[in-house]
Amino acid sequence: MGWVNRLFNREGNTPEYQELKFTLHRKLLDRINLEALSSMAGERVRTEIRSAVARLVDEEKTPLSLVEKDRVIEEILDEVFGLGPLEPLLQDPTVSDILVTTPKLVYVERGGKLYRTSVEFKDDAHLLRIIEKIVSRVGRRVDESSPLVDARLPDGSRVNAAIPPVAVDGPLLSIRRFGRYALKGEDLVAKLALTEGMLDLLKACVKARLNILICGGTGSGKTTLLNALSSYIPEDERIVTIEDAAELRLQQTHVARMETRPANVEGTGAIHIRQLVINALRMRPDRIIVGEVRAEEALDMLQAMNTGHDGSLTTIHANTPRDGLGRLEVMVGMANANMGLRSIRQQVASAVNLFVQVARFSDGSRRVTHITEVVGMEQDIITLQDVFLFEKTGITESGRVLGRFRATGIRPRFCERLKASGISLPPQLFQTVVEIN
């Protein structure tokens, strides 16, 4: 049975069906020899368990059609080998997020929009068991003393779970999935996330080793754009990546990846992003890429950008480039309370060359809304100038967002730096307007 039918067919998810499935699952665990199965090859194990479940179904003498029998067998196999009811969602390549709010309320994001599915867990205990299965696979734990967990599945998907007492109404689970292949800049142009001219500009900035900070809200496409831009880093450079949960997929050969680590049961042993940024400086990087700056590590990232690690990239949660500046100032202040505001702004202005703002719109589309140059300091204020903007002009009856990508006519000051790197951009690039109809 295809995952589409299993995902959206609400018939058959009756309490009686769920009870039958769990009765069979319990009996299966009592009957099979797990030790003997562990020595078998994967496909043979599935065959043995499939046969055992089929015998149990027959013994129950429950009137099931062949389709229903196949379905219950597949779902029990999902319980044994996979993540139970989540398996059909994980097999669906169009699903980007899986959001479990209650055992009976499971949503997916597809194409930037949320849809309720027919997927259900039996109860809180069933959902909690799947959460524990997920986190145990990656060496994490979740319990009353540690009720929050961030983890990464083997396929790179990012998992966040919360259980009582912090989750008031029962366990919560969110899975952020990533496509099988990382999107390239050209793919983003095809999806109308930006124009070809905007991509040419960003590509030139990466090659000329400008420091770029990508801003946006949750789910706006920051990591997707970061992945795409990183593909333009020359192959002969050494790149060090630092993330909370490794999700960047760089295509270059010489990439050193590091990931934070939470505290152990005793509350010790945590490794934070700031420690990894400091450590990265000792690893002879040509460029440092931080998945996201959230706190004190912002100071170390800026200092790295200012001390010979040009061409570094990172992301930050912010709604506009100016908001991104404000957040950076706060983060640097957290790292060094003795640093005056003017000194902080001088650090930021000398380190960051470019802000790229991304946003998700009501129709699910994601677009680059600003490409903004950091010009420098005027008295105590950091000056910015927009090079490209996306302007929303309306919404169709079907809900599609209309607008235009518009060059502001300003030729950025960093064009001289691009020229010094052997990169020239046509003057008309900074005069273009592209309508999204």
Predicted regions and their residues:
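N-terminal anchoring/assembly modules that precede and organize ATP-driven motor systems
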Residues: 1-115
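Active-site phosphate-binding and catalytic loops of NTP-dependent enzymes
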Residues: 36-39, 59-66, 81-92, 134-151, ...
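P-loop NTP-binding catalytic core
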Residues: 92, 100, 105-208, 426
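P-loop NTPase switch/communication element
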Residues: 179-190, 227, 231-278, 324-328
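Hydrophobic anchor at the beta1->P-loop junction of P-loop NTPases
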Residues: 214
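Conserved lysine of the Walker
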Residues: 222
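Conserved P-loop NTPase nucleotide-binding/switch module
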Residues: 243-256, 280-376
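NTP-binding/hydrolysis catalytic cores, primarily Walker-type P-loop NTPases
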Residues: 364-437
